[in-house]
Amino acid sequence: MGDFNLALVIVAIVVCVIVFISSIYLLVNYQHPDDANQAYFPKFVVVFGLSIAMISILMLPADVANRHACRHSIYNGACNLTLPMKDLWLAVYIVDAVLVFFIIPFAMFFYEGDQDKALGKRIKSALIWVVTTAVVCALVLGILYGVIGKVDFSVRHLSSATTTFPTSWQFSNNQPCIGNTARQCSAYTANAASEKTWSMRTTFPEYVVALATIVGSVLFTIFGGVGIACLPLGLITAFIRRPKAVITRSQYIKEATELGKKARDLKKAADALHQEERSGAKGRKWRKNVKAVEKELLQLEEDVNLLEEMYPQGEQAETAWAFTVLGYLAKFVLGILGLIVSVAWIAHIIIYLLVDPPLSPFLNEVFIKLDDVWGLLGTAAFAFFCFYLLLAVIAGAMMLGLKLVFITIHPMKWGATLMNSFLFNVGLILLCSISVIQFCATAFGYYAQATAAQEIFGHTLQSLRGIKYLYKYNVFQIGFVVLAGLTFLYYIAFGWRRKKPSGRFQLST
C-alpha cells in the first residue's frame, strides 16, 4: 500500500458527501416556487445527476493522487493501488450514459406531460418514448460494437538473435558472459518505418464510454468553444452596457407601461399556443413559435430587471443602487480573471496539443510546481480548470440558444428554474463532462501520466477503429480554438455596442 492511501480514502468520502450536499443546495435555491413540494422524481434525478457530474470531474485529480501514492514503485504493478480507478471510471460513465439517454429523457417527458392526464397515462407516454430510444440505442451500439468495436494499436516489430550460453565457465571481469558481438539486439538497426497494426476487441463498457464521449465531444466543441470566449467577455460587456445613472419617475412610468403592454401581448401569444397544443396541432410551426415566445419572454424578463436596476424603489433605494454598481464592478473583475483563464486555456491547447512536438508543458508544469508548494494546491488548480470548461459549456449553450432559433433555451435562474430546465442542463453537463475529462486527460497528459483515465481516454479511445482519426488530426481541439476565436472577434466587433430594440417585446428607447 502507498504512503497516502488512508488519507486518499478519507478525502474521497468527504468530497462525495460535500458534492451531494452542494447538489441539494443548488436544487433548493434554484427551483421554481411552482415545483415546491412536488416533482420529487425529477428532483432526485437532478441531485443524483449533478452529483455524478461533479464527482466525475473530481475523479481525475483523485486518479492523479492515486497514482502519486505509488510514485516510489518501479512500475505500476508493484503497488497495490488504493482505489480501483479504472473500474470506478467505467462505472461512473456507464451510469452517466444511462442517465443521459434514458433516465433524464423519461423524467423530462413525465414532467412536461399534460398535467390533466392521469398519472398512469403520463408514465406510459414517457415510457414509450424512452423504450423507443433504448431499442434504437441498443441496436446502434450492438451493430457498431460487433462490426467495428476494435482498437488498432500501431506497434514496431522488434527482434534479436539468441546467443549460445558458454560451457567453459572460465570467466573474469574482463570476459563477460555474452560475447562482445551480441551486446545489441537487431532492433538497434531496425527500419524506423517497420510498423505493424495490433488489433484487439475492446470491452463493451469501454466502447459505450467511447461513443458517449464522441457525442459529448461534438457538443463540447461547439458550446465549449463559444462559451470559453463568451463567459468572460459576456461579464465584461455587461459592465460596459451597465446603467450609468438612475432614471426619473416619469421615464420609469413610461417604460413600465410599455413593458406591461408587451407582457399582455406575450400572454395572449402563449395562451394561443396552449390552445393549439390542446387541439393536437403540435407541428414544426408550433414548436418554432414556442421557442420564439420563450426567447421573447427571456428578453422581457431582462428588460424588467434592467428597469428595476435603473429605478430602485423603497426605503433602501440608495443602498440598492450602490449594490447594483458593486455588482457590475464584480462582473468586471470576474470577467478579467475569467479572460485570463480562457486565454491560458487557448494558449495551452495551441502550444501543447496542436503543435507537434509540444513547445512547452505550460499548465502541466504550473500544476506540478503548485504541488511542490503544497500537496493539494496543484490538484485544486487542476480541478478548477476542468470545472471552468463545464461553466464555459453552459455559457455557450445559453448564448447560442439566444441567437439561434433551433436551439432550445433552458436558463438557470436563482429561485425561478423549472425542473425541465434543470433536467436539460444536468443532461448537458453529464454528456459534456465525459468529454471534459477526456479533454483534460489529453491536455494535461504530462501531469496526469500513468493514470487509469489516460489508459481509457488516451490509449483505447484514441485507437478505436473509425474514431481514432478524429483524435489523430485534432479535429475537436481545432474546432474548439476556431470557435473561440470567432466568438472573440464577434465580441470585439459587436459586444461593446448597447443593445437596440430588435423585437416586439424589447425595451423601448
UniProtKB/Swiss-Prot annotation:
This is LIMR family protein At5g01460. Its main location: membrane. Keywords: Coiled coil, Membrane, Transmembrane, Transmembrane helix. It is a multi-pass membrane protein. PANTHER family: LIMR FAMILY PROTEIN DDB_G0283707-RELATED. InterPro entries: LMBR1-like_membr_prot. The chain crosses the membrane at residues 8-28, 44-64, 90-110, 128-148, 208-228, 332-352, 382-402, 422-442, 475-495. GO terms for cellular component: plasma membrane. It comes from Arabidopsis thaliana (Mouse-ear cress). Belongs to the LIMR family. It is found in: Membrane. Residues 251-316 form a coiled coil.
